[in-house]
């Protein structure tokens, strides 16, 4: 994959929250489409959500490709809000993708644009650190600031 063809650096970063209970699930979300069916909108992230979700049920495979998936539920309300691509198939890995393997169902989450350090501009994926140290307190502070806006 060439980064010139598949660049996601200008995409907005979102805070993702559970629609059912408003629990903050991720502060590194990005709007995406399902590779196997581009009519399906969703959100994705590159880092697993912590202290907000957990695996549920058994692994399964899609009908369109051979990716191995597992559902993930919100710890606060128990609703399935995410699935994790545990083993991506070669077809999906070779296609233009963002290397995100945590996929949030658009009907189960809502997004809030995350602001950059100035608090004025929307944070873009290209300006997001590859790995962020976050604690529950950090996520709650982000959520409170964004909810007030």
Swiss-Prot record:
InterPro entries, alphabetized: YPEH2ZP
Residues passing through the membrane, by range: none
One Pfam family cited in the UniProt record for this chain = YPEH2ZP
Q: Name one GO cellular component term.
A: intracellular membrane-bounded organelle
Query: Belongs to which family?
Result: Belongs to the FAM72 family.
Q: What is this protein called?
A: Protein FAM72C
Q: Which organism is it from?
A: Homo sapiens
Primary gene name? FAM72C
